[in-house]
């Protein structure tokens, strides 16, 4: 393999612009092995072989991207582009987005090129399109439904007997959750409370739409209700804007939001040291192996007992790493704590996509998005435009962010429940175990609505939504410790 | 500039917390004139009054310096506002709160006989009582809010149900994924489904307040449409309606039925008041749409035994209308089908579609490796592996090649990523034969269908899944390619691998035992944790936490 790439180097050493490299590449088709299948046969690969080869290519490419060798990366990218396709089978689709992300990343090392290429690309920030994709995600996956159900249940239980309830929604994009809460409150034996919902979202239109739907429903149910829109990005949110008043019982709901606070500039330092390792890939290997070796045997046995995601690549490494301090997350959590909410419900992606090296993140995200794309494969026909939208505009963008961004730009810093628990605990919150009823309902939702293949695992009072054995999202409830 | 009345106040500010006694709060005329014994609510008023008697008087001046903000506690210990963190921001507020929530309702409206504890509330009500009318979309008028809500619940259920009906009949399994439909429509479906499910815990509360009406989130009925039999259809329909029940033990029963008797609900809907068929009832029900009261009350057979149905027809308010969440019915259908295969039980979480069941012949949820997910979409088409499965296979192959070629025992734990990593880096590294392996395995026909013939890095994978049945063993064995492992074992016998092999063999040979083994060890774990509890129980509860508990 190395030989092959060296061959490429030899032929394309004259070429300095991507276009030229491309042309020489297409003339001088690299062969997989000198004797066996030639490059043009790649198209004839069986899906499974193609899938494996795509994975292989992605990893090879990532190695080249990490070490910054454009030419080798380019060779791999070309093959990837031949095989990957956003409307092919699952692996082809995943590979298409990872390929784009990797290309994006290596292109960033040529800031001039990168900027020139993206200069005219006006970010088509179509609000309605964004809402539409979010809505499709809501429909195609049970994740938000389960999250909303568990969140509402936790709020209802915490607010038993309360007459003045204030709910803060840190991602006010989906009215369905609060419509459900309104109805649930309405059927409380002690009658509905005075309900105030504060929605935080950066787009005014979204909040307006939400306010309209909720006020309409509250009027229909005749529940005293007030919607308090806060147009702000979550990072710029001032706690004063939330207008929490004395005497009211406060609940906070955060759905897939907290991880954005982890974005920080301390990458600069980490990136530097990461680069050192990346230049020496075998070093990374060794380090990883070392990291695994202690405790892995014991943990493997532990896994036996607890049926704990047996093949999860992250379980071991996550626990052995110290929690990196994150000033912004901590100060935000502290600010929330200062409002002394009766309950705070947090939904997060349960994956470890915040590794310091590209390779770590690539591997972890490959597994996660493989599972997510598999979910779609079982539910939605391949030709569906909606499916492609979700894959491209939601997952594709996330992948791009995880793979090709660094520093403040890298916002999709998904972390495992374990780490979130530590953080939230440190901020002065105590875990509120999700009730039996909540879990029962969530399981029924999965069973009853055709979401086969999903599972809900209980992990120390929190819920982990899994696809098969792969944990995807976690829901946990908290309250102020005093 | 208009003064803001409701200045937001953050509760955690360093305000002075004041606890007043009930007597102080209830006192109407705390400030008494010593001459004429007239009482006043405020001292300022008394001072002004004293002027009339030519007594010395003094009005308090507004102090220029910033006064420390005060917050007031409710004296009632069971009240949420008894907690300092939930104190109320002003004196009038706490007084009214105390009257409203913990005081006697002395003021009664003559028109609707609603009672109020605070006179101003009563006054405000009296002004609007009778003038405000509640109009339902169906055209019916109500003067009282609760009758209106009762009506709305029924009326909504009907509207939603009739809107859903056509789709139910087609019984699309993917009902909640109406790709072709417009967003609004699917919006309603999806959200109401949540609603339906969010009610499922609610029936426990019903015995307290008969006047309460639960609104049905009938969206769950749509989910029920996934099943196709006619009884299922009925169940789905019925789920849109209210069941009447006055059975305090309803909760228990429901609980019980969650666990064991899911199936029996499915077809057994019993119509309490009408000899007509269920479907006819439905029809009639929808005809009665415009009357405020429904003419038929449906009941479930499991409730009928101890259920005296009150006359809901004439007075919907008096009746405790209970919504049995559609989720129950719908799940029961599901369980009905699944029990035969998986053995049922609330705990069996991952239910697999039937095509899986048939192909993989009695696989319980935990033990189905995700490789099988590939066959979910089209069981009859050529097998295509899911992306997850491909990644796993890649990881396996990576480990194989690294074992065979590097000669180094790369710590075969079940951490797939390290293996995958070595897969990637191995290729990048010195070994050309890695790729040879990769390509060889392509040509190896055994490798395409399943992972046969590949050394398994998931030595403990099978072991992870407790309680595999005998049937499944062959599956698992094929899957893990144990034969190959044994072969490769002889080549390189690292400790890890031996361990792995042992695990595999255990898994094969002592499968029946594995459950017991796990059980007994968890037993001992239980015991030890109990010991810990009894030993250090009181000491281990941290004081702040305890206080916290008490305060809520």
Curated annotation (Swiss-Prot), chain A:
Region (Leucine repeat I (LRI)) spans which residues? 52-115
Write out the annotated subcellular location.
Answer: Nucleus
Give the span(s) annotated as SAW.
Answer: 404-479
Q: Give yes or no: UniProt keyword Membrane.
A: no
Pfam families in the cross-refs: GRAS (PF03514)
Q: Which GO terms describe its biological process?
A: regulation of DNA-templated transcription; response to gibberellin
Spell out the residue ranges making up region: PFYRE.
Answer: 250-401
Region of interest called Disordered, as start-end residue ranges on this chain: 302-324
Protein name (record): Scarecrow-like protein 3
What is the source species? Arabidopsis thaliana (Mouse-ear cress)
């Amino acid at each position: 393999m190395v030989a092959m790439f060296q061959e490429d180097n030899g032929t394309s050493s004259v070429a300095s612009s991507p276009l030229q490299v491309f042309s020489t590449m297409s003339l001088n088709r690299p062969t997989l092995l000198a004797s066996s299948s030639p490059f043009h046969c790649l198209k004839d690969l069986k899906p499974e072989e193609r899938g494996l080869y795509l994975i292989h290519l992605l990893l090879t490419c990532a190695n080249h991207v990490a070490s910054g060798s454009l030419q080798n990366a380019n060779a791999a990218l070309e093959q990837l582009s031949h095989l990957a396709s956003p409307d092919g089978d699952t692996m082809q689709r995943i590979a298409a987005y990872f390929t784009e992300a990797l290309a994006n990343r290596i292109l960033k090392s040529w800031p001039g090129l990168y900027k020139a290429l993206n200069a005219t690309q006006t970010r088509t920030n179509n609000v309605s399109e964004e809402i539409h994709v979010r809505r499709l995600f809501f429909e195609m996956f049970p994740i938000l439904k389960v999250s909303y159900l568990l969140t509402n249940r936790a709020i209802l239980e915490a607010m038993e007997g309360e007459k003045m309830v204030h709910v803060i929604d840190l991602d006010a994009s989906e009215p369905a959750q609060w419509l459900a809460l309104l109805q649930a409150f309405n059927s409380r034996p002690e009658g509905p409370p005075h309900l105030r919902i504060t929605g935080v979202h950066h787009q005014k239109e979204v909040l307006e739409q939400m306010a309209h739907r909720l006020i309409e429903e509250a009027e229909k149910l005749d529940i005293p209700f007030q919607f308090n829109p806060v147009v702000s990005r979550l990072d710029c949110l001032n706690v004063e804007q939330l207008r929490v008043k004395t005497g009211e019982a406060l609940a906070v709901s955060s759905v897939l939001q907290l991880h954005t606070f982890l974005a920080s500039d301390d990458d600069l330092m980490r990136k530097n040291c990461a680069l050192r390792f990346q230049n020496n890939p075998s070093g990374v290997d060794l380090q990883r192996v070392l990291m695994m070796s202690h405790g892995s045997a014991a943990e493997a046995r532990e896994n036996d007992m607890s049926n704990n995601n047996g093949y999860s690549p992250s379980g071991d490494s996550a626990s052995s790493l110290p929690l990196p301090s994150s000033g912004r997350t901590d100060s935000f959590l502290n600010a929330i704590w200062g409002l002394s909410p009766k309950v705070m419900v947090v939904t997060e992606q349960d994956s470890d996509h915040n590794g310091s090296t590209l390779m770590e993140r690539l591997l972890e995200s490959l597994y996660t998005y493989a599972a997510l794309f598999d979910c779609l494969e079982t539910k939605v026909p391949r030709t569906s435009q909606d499916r492609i939208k979700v894959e491209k505009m939601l997952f594709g963008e996330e992948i791009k962010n995880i793979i090709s961004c660094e520093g403040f730009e890298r916002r999709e810093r998904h972390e495992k429940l374990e780490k979130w628990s530590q953080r939230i605990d440190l901020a002065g919150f105590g875990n509120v175990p999700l009730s039996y009823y909540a879990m029962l309902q969530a399981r029924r939702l999965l069973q009853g609505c055709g979401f086969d293949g999903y599972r809900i695992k209980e992990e120390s009072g929190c819920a982990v939504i899994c696809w098969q054995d792969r944990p995807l999202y976690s829901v946990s409830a908290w309250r102020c410790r005093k | 500039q208009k003064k803001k009345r409701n200045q937001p106040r953050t509760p955690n500010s360093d305000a002075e917390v004041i606890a007043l006694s009930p007597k102080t709060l209830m006192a109407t005329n705390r400030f008494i004139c010593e001459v004429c014994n007239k009482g006043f609510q405020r001292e300022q008023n008394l001072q002004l009054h004293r002027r009339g008697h030519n007594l010395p008087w003094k009005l308090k001046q507004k102090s220029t310096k910033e006064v420390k903000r005060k917050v007031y506690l409710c004296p009632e210990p069971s009240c949420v506002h008894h907690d300092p963190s939930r104190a109320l921001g002003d004196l009038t507020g706490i007084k009214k709160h105390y009257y409203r929530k913990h005081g006697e309702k002395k003021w009664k409206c003559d028109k609707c006989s609603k009672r109020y504890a605070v006179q101003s509330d009563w006054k405000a009500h009296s002004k609007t009582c009778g003038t405000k009318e509640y109009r339902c979309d169906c055209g019916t008028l109500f003067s009282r809010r609760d009758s209106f809500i009762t009506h709305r619940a029924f009326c909504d259920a009907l509207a939603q149900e009739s809107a859903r009906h056509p789709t139910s009949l087609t019984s699309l399994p993917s009902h909640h994924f109406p790709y072709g439909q417009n967003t609004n429509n699917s919006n309603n479906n999806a959200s109401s489904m949540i609603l339906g499910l969010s009610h499922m815990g609610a029936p426990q509360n019903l015995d307290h307040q008969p006047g309460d009406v639960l609104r049905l989130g009938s969206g769950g009925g749509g989910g029920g449409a996934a099943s196709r039999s006619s009884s299922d259809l009925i169940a789905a329909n019925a789920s849109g309606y209210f069941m009447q029940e006055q059975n305090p033990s309803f909760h228990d029963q429901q609980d019980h039925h969650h666990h064991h008797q899911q199936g029996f609900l499915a077809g057994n809907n019993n119509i309490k008041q009408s000899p007509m068929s269920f479907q006819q009832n439905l029809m009639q029900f929808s005809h009665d749409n415009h009357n405020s009261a429904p003419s038929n009350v449906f009941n479930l057979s499991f409730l009928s035994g101890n259920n005296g149905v009150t006359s809901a027809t004439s007075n919907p308010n008096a009746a405790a209308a209970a919504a049995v969440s559609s989720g129950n019915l719908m799940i029961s259908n599901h369980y009905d089908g699944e029990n035969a295969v998986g053995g049922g039980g609330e705990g069996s979480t991952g239910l697999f579609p039937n095509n899986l069941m048939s192909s993989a012949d009695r696989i319980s949820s935990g033990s189905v490796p995700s490789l099988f997910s590939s066959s979910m979409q089209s069981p009859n088409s050529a097998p295509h592996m899911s992306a997850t499965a491909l990644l796993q296979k890649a990881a396996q192959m990576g480990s194989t090649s690294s074992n065979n070629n590097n000669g180094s025992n790369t710590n075969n734990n079940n951490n797939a990523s390290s293996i995958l990593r070595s897969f990637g880096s191995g290729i990048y590294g010195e070994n050309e034969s890695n790729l040879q392996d990769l390509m060889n395995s392509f040509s190896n026909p055994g490798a395409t269908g399943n992972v046969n013939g590949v050394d398994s890095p998931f030595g403990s994978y099978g072991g992870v899944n407790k309680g595999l049945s005998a049937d499944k063993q062959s599956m698992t064995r094929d899957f893990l390619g144990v034969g190959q492992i044994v072969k490769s074992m002889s080549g390189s016998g690292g400790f890890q691998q031996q361990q792995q092999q042992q695990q595999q063999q255990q898994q094969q040979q002592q499968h029946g035992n594995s459950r017991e083994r796990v059980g007994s060890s968890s037993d001992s774990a239980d015991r030890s944790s109990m010991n810990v509890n009894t030993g250090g129980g009181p000491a281990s509860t941290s004081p702040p936490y305890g206080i916290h508990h008490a305060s809520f």
